[in-house]
Regions:
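Short, glycine/acidic-rich beta->alpha junctions
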Residues: 17-19, 57, 146-150
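Structural signature of outer-membrane beta-barrel channels/translocons
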Residues: 2-3, 26-32, 64-74, 82, ...
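Outer-membrane beta-barrel translocator/channel fold
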Residues: 34-100, 171-183
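Outer-membrane beta-barrel initiation region
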Residues: 1-33, 102-124
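Short, flexible loop/turn elements at secondary-structure junctions
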Residues: 16, 81, 134-138
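Residue-level detector of the transmembrane beta-barrel scaffold of outer-membrane proteins
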Residues: 9-11, 35-39, 74-78, 129-133, ...
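C-terminal outer-membrane beta-barrel translocator/porin domains of Gram-negative envelope proteins
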Residues: 41, 45, 51, 98-99, ...
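Short amphipathic alpha-helical segments, especially helix-boundary/capping motifs
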Residues: 2, 83-88, 94-95, 106, ...
């Protein structure tokens, strides 16, 4: 019971070609009513654009606060920092002369969550879940790009027969800004 109110979680995903990898570590402090969580995440993705190979590195840091009003309702705030680097593989004279692209992003996300569901077993839920959220991301450099997203997600799972469940989902979102999402 020494770490009953504290959690340390880590994870990784390594691809077969060892080029696209992800690493994550999380620390949660749950000993007061206001829960705190810090998440560090690193992702490396190898991709091809035209005739050139790129490697994208993304380092993200999240600070998450959760305030439960009761067992079913909570308010969540997430502060985000993200630093992206795009590196072109040196295959010829042109690609060797290209400089790395670097972008910094800062963001905030506010969520209201209603969750009356109960997990019966892995991926089998019964009950209702509703989330309403708004998120703002701002690129920290000369371009001054930003993104605002607002949306909702509602899910309902009901028992049909024994362990059979009927799940229904309704969701939607809209985004605005100089750097909109492409669906």
């Amino acid at each position: 019971d020494l770490f009953e109110d504290y959690r340390i979680t880590g994870g990784f995903r390594i691809s077969f070609d060892l080029q696209s990898n992800e690493f994550m570590i999380s620390y949660e402090d749950l000993h007061k009513r206001l829960d705190h969580q810090v998440v560090a995440y690193r992702q490396g993705i190898k991709s091809m654009v035209g005739d050139y190979y790129y490697k994208q590195y993304a380092n993200s840091l999240f600070y998450i606060m959760k305030y439960p009003f009761n067992k079913l309702n909570s308010l969540r705030l997430t502060l985000t920092g993200r630093y992206e680097t795009y590196v072109m593989a040196g295959l010829n004279d042109y690609s060797l002369k290209q400089k790395d692209e670097r972008h910094g992003w800062a963001g905030v996300k506010l969520e209201y969550v209603f969750d009356s569901s109960k997990e019966l077993c892995t991926n089998l839920w019964r009950g209702s879940k509703v989330k309403v959220f708004a998120e703002y991301q701002h690129r920290i450099d000369k371009d001054n790009k930003y993104l605002f997203v607002a949306g909702f997600d509602a899910r309902k799972s009901v028992k049909v027969f024994r362990n059979m469940t009927w799940a229904t989902r309704l969701s939607g979102s809209a985004n605005f800004g100089t750097s909109p999402l492409i669906y």
